[in-house]
């Protein structure tokens, strides 16, 4: 649609010999071209033009019979606006015979006149030849004179210096241009920039567009600042202050609470449920208004049933610190008052039982008792030997849910105990607090669902009438982790998604936008609520740590060691002819250790900086919380065992990782260990010294040593160890949980290699106690059975050898020992025993030699490797007496007064081990210690904020030394210091080293936070304010950029950007060699041709593997990748295809028009609701009035209007270019249609 003020430019373009068809689609019914309506001013000398004036009716335009009307001269269909300008300021004067309609406005009347140009008089000192033309022709057919310079020709010649001759000459007064504009086309908002709105093209509305690939000659494209505008705008509009809309009871929450703008746009269902909670609780504010709202909607949802007959559940997605615990206590209290006196409450730690009791007590439910499940003996909970517990709350951890008694019996599992206590018709409350712990029910790749997830699902299926509540700030960082939330009714019988897999495919295929819709839909149905504390006052900062020269040298030495190790692993595996399955296991362990090793180096580089910052903050009157994920206790215990219980120095965790890998997983079989495991007496055979026996001696197959593994697992078990009960039963349950989780993680890692979800730093050490893949796994036999067994079944031996990859070529080597094979087998085997013996014996010795060489290299490097981060931090910050440690480990290495190093237990005489973390927390909150170090074990439920009720009210500075590997744990850690009822909001400091690979971990967290904010809070922008989104590479743009990078390095594609200019050497050659060293580029053995790894465009794998490259290489490669990614994103934005998620339309100068609305009824749940689909059109851009004002003020030689070279929708686009910096040739341009202001 054309603004009334467009007539000025159209007239000028027409006079210049340019057809308006170049600008507009004349056939469009929506485009009405305005007639130029100049009003003659007193300042115009009448002698300048010999004008013939004739009065005519306003509705008609007088034309010569033979004249073809120009589009610029079409009559206006509406009352024209008034435009005033000086005629002689048009540089290109009209040709003879041109007819111009003039409108002259007086206070009384408006008259229209037709001006026919009969004569041209030059008034300037420079004479200009007159142009004679008998009639006006269409601009498309008229051949202009030499003096008429056409804009089209100038642009075709790419000559910006030839200015479009529409600019006023410098010796003439500036033109005056006014035009009335109509802004009635829809609501126009002025709050935000137009750059947020995506292009929406509607078929019935023809809109003019600016070609995204248009290039202005001689204008160097700079990085466009509009990206920053978008981000700032997104931050400003991400949250809306929250107050319950449809529930008017309760007092205001003590702290400001917000909701994402996406969720706030959806209203929850009407409230019809009446709560039974006492007025005293409500009036005293023991439950705030928003907590009462959650209780009411949960109880209301519990009154409905899903199509499959199960009672509907409710999901509380409130952020950390809002008060989910008190809300859950309120739901239990509400049901208790209605006669449902039994409830089950699951959480992640037994420590949180005390918080549950506190929450119930605080809301006035003192008579509801809380019992720990792991304190009960196996058997009926209501029996006498369990205290005849028949009502109250049973508090259990997820690990105890899968606990099992070894003694047997009818109720030998905790799950059966619970099911019996509840009963088949149980309609009480089951709460899954911190329910992200039940994730991974839906397996990825070849992994298996976790036992925890299966148990949670079974409990819900066995109790269909139970009132289920899911509660977690991180309920589902990915939709795949929602598999256990089957009570939400999103999938299943009677819903659009028959199976959960159907739901997953639909959501994941559509990306983050679909997850936002899922959250909004759940709120609309009344099954979901998500609020979080306002982040006002919270500061976020990313502190990049510089690396010292000594550190870089140590790092590069480590890289060379790992490159050498990779070659040795490959050579040794080929020497012993290992099977493919065993190779896969070997490489899985190798790359897992590779990632852990360099992760520990990355963390170690930041210790000095953290200590420095911590000391500064303490001096400034603040207190410090340092977040870690791994404690490295397993390596400490291994070193302690090797040293006979004594230590000479702090243990190097990195060294322990590499040493454990070589000793347990290097493919160099130990034949003595093999035969001892198989029960074969080698000494009895040694006297024969027969060649046919020798091949068997080099075979090494492993089985699990039951006693040893059990002992090591108990030693190394850390997470949850301090949270468990002192009873034997709870200990065994905790062990079972750890083994179950870690076994699943291990299998998942082996199946997917470098999957981002794999946690290489989990506290359980069972991964390092995994069986050597070169040894078979064998069930534990009792000692008595071993003594009785005189012979070995040859089939079992052969299968064991086959499992190790050693039995296929030498199947008969055990014939003399076993004595049960046939004579024909003996004969066939003896025919080639000599050659087989020589080859295999030599291979094993060479493999053993390689193993020894690697261990020797490690010892040389070990002097430079950093010590355990946690021990070093505590030592540097003043020792255990000054630092409150809240981790899962049981002991630590300390520096004594005499300078010696020793290992000591964390337990204290007056503090039971099960409440050690709670005691340390209290010391921190009381101000006895001003520094706290928390690990994952303390990341759930523990409150460390500057609480008004605590003695220590210093401002918290939360330093994240080690970014959690998943968003679940990141949110939990961030929420420890930002909670309700705090005096001051915390400061967050994220320490990231300048190592390129280090940003890999920030990338994963950023990805998870983005997805997390989208799903659990309905808006992906909810997590952008955490200042980590700039490290998010794992998206479609990142994968596209990585594909371009990898292909350009192996010369399969041309580079999109130039390599870093400061790289010393041949960038592509050096980086190619580095990527070969980390396995991302393969070299064919025979041809030497370079091929890319099958997962070459996997962002996680790429950023993980480049950790193993030298510092300058990985930094340069990462810079090259980042530059390519920026180019990819810029192209996507210019093409209008950049995914910006849910956005607000009409927030700037856009004109939004509603074209159509369709309503759809939403099936799958009983509550009424519908979905509305709006079809709208959005028009954006600068008005012609604004454009002409800017045009009038131009002074630069290259300023003016330009046309795009490319045609889109059969139209060209005009842009206004203004010179900003003549020296740098920096220009400001405005796309008239899209309104993009760029430099």
UniProtKB/Swiss-Prot annotation:
The terms under GO molecular function for this entry are:
chromatin DNA binding; histone binding
Q: Where in the cell is it found?
A: Nucleus
**Bias regions of kind Acidic residues — which residues?**
728-744
Q: Which UniProt keywords apply?
A: Coiled coil, Inflammatory response, Nucleus, Wnt signaling pathway
Mark out the compositionally biased spans (Basic and acidic residues).
694-713
Question: Which InterPro entries has this protein been placed in?
Answer: P-loop_NTPase, SBNO_Helicase_C_dom, SNO, SNO_AAA
Give the Pfam families listed for this entry: AAA_34, Helicase_C_4, SBNO
Give coiled-coil spans as residue ranges.
Answer: 838-866
Q: Where is the composition biased (Low complexity)?
A: 814-837
Provide GO CC annotations from the record: nucleus
Q: Where is this region: Disordered?
A: 684-837
Q: Return the Basic residues bias intervals.
A: 778-790
> Alphabetically, which GO biological process terms does the record hold?
negative regulation of canonical NF-kappaB signal transduction; negative regulation of MAPK cascade; negative regulation of neuroinflammatory response; positive regulation of canonical Wnt signaling pathway; positive regulation of neural precursor cell proliferation; regulation of DNA-templated transcription
Query: Into which family does the record put it?
Result: Belongs to the SBNO family.
Q: What is the role of this chain? A: Plays a crucial role in the regulation of neural stem cells (NSCs) proliferation. Enhances the phosphorylation of GSK3B through the PI3K-Akt signaling pathway, thereby upregulating the Wnt/beta-catenin signaling pathway and promoting the proliferation of NSCs.
For this entry, the protein name equals Protein strawberry notch homolog 1
Write down the species: Gallus gallus
Q: Which gene encodes it?
A: SBNO1
